[in-house]
Amino acid sequence: MTKLVVGLGNPGSKYHETRHNVGFMAIDLMAKELGLTFSEEKTFKAEVASTFLNGEKVYFVKPTTFMNLSGLAVRALLAYYNIPMEDFIVIYDDLDMEVGKLRFRQKGSAGGHNGIKSIIAETGTQEFDRIKIGIGRPQKGMTVVNHVLGKFSEDDYAMILLTLDKVETALHHYLKTNDFEDTMRRYNG
């Protein structure tokens, strides 16, 4: 079996560690912990790192398409490696959740998230596993765009780092057990 774990974000140093890039941050942490390095795969429009965990090939992916076209990379990788949707998981930010809150879902709408909209449009389904990381709503007077493309405050960044550690632990559990429902029960919150 092969797994595809995708973190959403925008490429480039301008967006490094912005709220919208918590998916990239989660993937980077996982790759670092496993001693993996990313290579740019232009065919897939993504940076890809891979390893074997518990006898399964696992691809960790950061699309290089910018958020709104993330589905292009996901569709290309799923097709090339013949990975079924049940073996695909995506990690991304959610501004409707408090900063640092963690939520696992098995399916659902895009909820206004353009990266998820793109994945749904390209794969033709909402039936895929997700890990959502709360980034909170913008402060009064700030636009959503400025909020999601902005950096975390020092306090929020500290909370996000704790959440990313929890994501890493949850991903290890999921990849070991292949049981997303159990992972949801253990790590939602």
UniProtKB/Swiss-Prot annotation:
UniProt site (Stabilizes the basic form of H active site to accept a proton): 93
Keywords attached to this entry: Cytoplasm, Hydrolase, RNA-binding, tRNA-binding
Residues the UniProt record annotates as site (Discriminates between blocked and unblocked aminoacyl-tRNA): 10
Annotated positions binding tRNA: 15, 66, 68, 114
Coiled-coil ranges from the UniProt annotation: none
GO molecular function: peptidyl-tRNA hydrolase activity; tRNA binding
InterPro entries membership: Pept_tRNA_hydro, Pept_tRNA_hydro_CS, Pept_tRNA_hydro_sf
GO CC entries: cytoplasm
GO biological processes: protein quality control for misfolded or incompletely synthesized proteins; rescue of stalled ribosome
Enzyme class: hydrolase
Pfam families reported in the protein's UniProt record: Pept_tRNA_hydro
Residues of the active site: 20 (proton acceptor)
Family statement drawn from the similarity comment of this UniProt entry: Belongs to the PTH family.
Summary of the function given for this chain in its UniProt record: Hydrolyzes ribosome-free peptidyl-tRNAs (with 1 or more amino acids incorporated), which drop off the ribosome during protein synthesis, or as a result of ribosome stalling. Catalyzes the release of premature peptidyl moieties from peptidyl-tRNA molecules trapped in stalled 50S ribosomal subunits, and thus maintains levels of free tRNAs and 50S ribosomes.
Subunit and interaction comment: Monomer.
NCBIfam families linked to this entry: pth
Protein name: Peptidyl-tRNA hydrolase
Provenance organism: Streptococcus thermophilus (strain ATCC BAA-250 / LMG 18311)
Lineage of source species: Bacteria, Bacillati, Bacillota, Bacilli, Lactobacillales
